[in-house]
A protein has these predicted regions:
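A short glycine-rich, Lys/Arg-flanked "PGG" loop and its adjoining helix->strand segment in the class I
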Residues: 122-134
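Residues lining the SAM
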Residues: 108-110
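A short acidic, Gly/Pro-enriched loop at the edge of an enzyme's catalytic core
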Residues: 97-104
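SAM-dependent methyltransferase
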Residues: 139-213
């Protein structure tokens, strides 16, 4: 099972809509500052496709990739409301392959932190730049080492009418890895609650490490 497979059906309900809207608007402002006009966009680690769909609705032609089949199922259902839906592709980031170059690439909501091995993030960067047009932009965010360290031995909860999610987080200074232990409870149609468990791992990449890997 890939990360977020069990969580996929409840993921959007646990995220505030405003986060996506603000992120899409911010990305569009950055696109306007690009050295080349941005019409085609790669969304790397797209999750349930909310950002990809918002950009599609703003007129961009979007190719969106993710490793979770369940996340992409949610994304495809969401994209049915788009006039020009994104193209969703089941791919891992280090094995990225596109049929043609794009004007811009994005990776949001700490997707790159899930690459815990140096060779994987280095290969991901190499492939992103391989499929970027000359002058194209690569825009991404990460959870910082400071944030992930602060999450050590913490407990977080998210709740909707039909789901309850508990996150327990632990940080290993030696490995620079933050482990998320996720218990998800979903209300079934018969009134019983169903429990799923997932474990996620994020690597704390420093600015210096990312700069070196990008060079």
């Amino acid at each position: 099972m890939s990360s977020y497979d069990a969580l996929a059906a409840s993921y959007d309900g646990l995220m505030a809509d405003g986060v996506y809207l603000r992120r899409a608007a911010y990305l569009e402002r950055l696109f306007r500052r690009s050295a080349i006009p941005v019409r085609t966009v790669l969304d790397l680690g797209c999750g349930t496709g909310t950002i990809a769909c918002l950009l599609s609705q703003r007129g961009y032609r979007v190719t969106a990739t993710d490793l979770s089949e369940e996340m992409l199922t949610q994304a495809a259902e969401k994209a049915m409301a788009c006039k020009e839906p994104p193209l969703f592709v089941l791919q891992s980031m280090p094995r990225l392959h596109l049929p043609e170059p794009v004007d811009a690439a994005i990776s949001t909501l700490d997707s790159l932190n899930y690459l815990t091995r140096e060779r994987d993030i280095r290969e991901t960067f190499r492939r992103v730049f391989r499929f970027l047009k000359p002058g194209g932009s690569f825009i991404f965010d990460v959870n910082t080492p400071y944030k992930l360290r602060r999450m050590d031995c913490q407990l977080y909860t998210d709740e909707t009418e039909e789901s309850y999610c508990v996150w327990r987080t632990f940080f290993s200074e030696k490995q620079k890895i933050c482990t998320y232990q996720v218990d998800l409870f979903r209300l079934r149609s018969d009134g019983a609650w169903e429990r799923d468990y997932e474990e996620h791992r994020e690597r704390a990449w420093s600015a210096a490490e990312l700069t070196e890997l990008l060079s």
